[in-house]
Amino acid sequence: MPYFGWFIVLGISLGIVIWQISVWLGETKDKMEKYQTALAYALSRNKPLLIAGGPYGNQRIRHLLKMPAHGNGDVCLDIDRNAIDGHPNAIIASVTHIPFPDKTFGAVFASHLLEHLPTTTEAKQALDELNRTAEAIFIVSPSWQSISGWLHPDHHLWVWQDGKTTHFKQRGKSSIKKKKEYTVNHD
């Protein structure tokens, strides 16, 4: 019986690891599906695809292993040069001030980007910019079930999409409090 406690701890730990792997696999599947949908949408409009949030992020290991988190698109925008290093059409700019004319892009794919903005106000400003420059927006962000999403110190918002509605929730605010503040409809 002295090892029973250790078996319980091991079982719980293994359960958490399996759960987080399944969450990660779900996020990866969602990201790849949305990227492919964004690419197909841009092609159907005969316009370029904008990637907001570089495929390499701020992880140098992705460059070394040549493992981008997603495709490059036609134009890639990020505030961090490392995230877009090597892209032939890389633009260093903020998602809240995109330096392109209205509806330049058929679609924009924003991956693991908006949750880094400090407030819902800035996230709405970014969403307005994305809507201004592209005909369709495809957003990917960490799942609420992702432990790393909760622990990441630079994640200030929860972001999710339901069809053509994008939701923002400032971390630390009650879900009862002004739900309207967190919801933005877009076409």
What is the meaning of each model-derived region?
Residues 2-44:
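Class I SAM-dependent methyltransferase Rossmann-like catalytic core
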Residues 45-59, 176-187:
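Metal-centered catalytic cores of metalloenzymes
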Residues 47-146:
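Conserved SAM-binding loop
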Residues 35-39, 45-49, 73, 87-88, ...:
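Generic structural motif recognizing short loop/turn segments at the entrances and edges of beta-strands
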Residues 120-187:
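S-adenosyl-L-methionine-dependent methyltransferase catalytic module, highlighting the catalytic core
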Residues 25, 29, 68, 147-152:
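Alpha-helical membrane-targeting segments
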Residues 5-8, 106, 169:
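Compositionally biased, low-structure terminal segments
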Residues 31-41, 54, 60-67, 140, ...:
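A broadly tuned "polar low-complexity/structure-edge" signature
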